[in-house]
């Protein structure tokens, strides 16, 4: 294999208000990733510079970084992948499952939770996160301001986007909610959303959100169980063709519909270009306690078959809706594959490439010219790393921003000695 020549990858033209500042960092020092295995089985060297992939060549073919501060990272035994992204988080309520009473909504406490949860998800591999934030009522914009402070503090480590979620947008209380939503966008929310199912007039709620999105050029991300075919049809008719795009989820209610009705609803969503964020780990703070707040196996498969862009998120992260939520995109992919929604490769694509599309971020491939947003996981194949990929190296904007190392050792045993089994997991074999 010869060294690849940098090219200009196709990138979608930015439309409307940008969610994040995801431009490559021209100041990032050169970095050589040596001996990494790619998804197609090749073992390669990858040189990064200026926040992008500069070159990809056969292992040992690329020169080490020069003396200007560049470094070399040995990735022998690691699978190198485009980094995941988190399309559906609730960081403002994360890590509150063990609170003895209602979690504090003081800005400093929310900021601490958001920052800790974002770093936790970064450690799992997600270099971009979209978090839903409640605005209005008594809390005003406090939680949003905390998220925006965390975004500034985490700049250079992970990209963080806020979705503003007002409670009510119709009726007597709707005027205040609409004003708060506009203020949220002006303050820094990159996406508008909410949960129309909980409004007295769900259709009116959607109309209000779409109006604000059109006014400010924002993307839309709405919570819905998706159990009402007529309501989904109206949403598809209203939102179809909106740029920069509409995402809904988790849509678990589709599983309760007759098969033909669910297929028709999925076809309408596909025709309208609406994406769906599933939550295979279950639990979502916005819909906590509802009849279909868990995960419904088969929904993602049905949507994919209809041509809907399906991504998968973590949802609740150790809060009241899911006290054991992990926020790990590899676990989300593992569950998609385990439920039979798709194969391992497509499952990983749902939390990486499809997730980046939903977030409006540039495509990532392990090829010259693409953004250096990468995840190295110890293992040889995608199915193995989804099952046992604990050791991870995360690269954002061309530099290593997180490392997690796991070593598994076994005590002496006559059987393992007789079979010549390792006491410690092999670096190039069984993942750790």
Predicted regions and their residues:
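His/Asp/Glu-enriched, well-ordered alpha-helical/loop segment
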Residues: 240-244, 297-377
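Active-site mouth loops of central-metabolism enzymes
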Residues: 100-112, 163-175, 195-197
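Active-site core of metal-dependent hydrolases
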Residues: 166-172, 186-295
């Amino acid at each position: 294999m010869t060294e690849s020549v940098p090219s200009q990858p196709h990138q979608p033209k930015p439309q409307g208000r940008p969610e994040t500042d995801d431009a490559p960092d021209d100041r990032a020092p050169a970095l050589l990733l040596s001996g990494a295995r790619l998804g197609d089985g090749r073992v390669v060297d990858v040189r990064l510079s200026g926040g992008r992939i500069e070159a990809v060549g056969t292992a040992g073919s690329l020169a080490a970084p020069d003396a200007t501060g560049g470094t070399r990272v040995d990735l022998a035994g690691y699978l190198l992948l485009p980094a995941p992204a988190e399309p559906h988080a609730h960081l403002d309520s994360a890590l509150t499952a063990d609170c003895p009473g209602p979690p504090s909504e003081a800005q400093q406490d929310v900021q601490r939770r958001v920052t800790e949860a974002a770093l936790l998800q970064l450690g799992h591999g997600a270099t971009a996160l979209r978090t839903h934030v409640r605005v209005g009522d008594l809390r005003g914009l406090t939680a949003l301001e905390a998220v925006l402070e965390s975004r500034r503090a985490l700049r250079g480590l992970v990209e963080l986007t806020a979705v503003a979620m007002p409670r009510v947008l119709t009726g007597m209380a709707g005027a205040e909610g609409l004003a708060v939503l506009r203020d949220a966008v002006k303050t820094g929310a990159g996406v508008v959303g909410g949960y129309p199912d909980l409004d007295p007039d769900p259709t009116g709620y959607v109309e209000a959100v779409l109006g604000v999105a059109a006014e400010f050029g924002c993307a839309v991300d709405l919570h819905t169980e998706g159990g009402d075919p007529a309501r989904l049809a109206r949403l598809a008719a209203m939102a179809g063709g909106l740029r920069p795009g509409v995402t809904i989820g988790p849509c678990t209610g589709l599983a309760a519909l007759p098969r033909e009705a669910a297929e028709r609803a999925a076809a309408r969503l596909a025709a309208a270009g609406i994406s769906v964020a599933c939550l295979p780990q279950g639990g979502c703070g916005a819909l906590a306690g509802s009849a279909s707040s868990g995960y419904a196996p088969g929904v993602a498969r049905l949507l994919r078959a209809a041509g809907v862009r399906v991504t998968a998120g973590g949802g609740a992260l150790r809060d009241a809706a899911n006290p054991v939520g992990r926020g790990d995109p590899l676990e989300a992919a593992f569950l998609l594959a385990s439920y039979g929604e798709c194969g391992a490769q497509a499952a990983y694509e749902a939390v990486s490439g499809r997730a980046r599309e939903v977030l409006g971020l540039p495509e990532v491939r392990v090829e010259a010219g693409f953004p250096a947003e990468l995840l190295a996981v110890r293992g040889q194949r995608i199915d193995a790393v989804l099952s046992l990929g604990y050791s991870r190296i995360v690269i954002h904007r061309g530099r290593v921003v997180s490392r997690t190392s796991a070593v598994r050792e076994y005590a002496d045993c006559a059987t393992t000695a007789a079979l010549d089994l390792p006491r410690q997991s092999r670096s190039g074999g069984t993942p750790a």
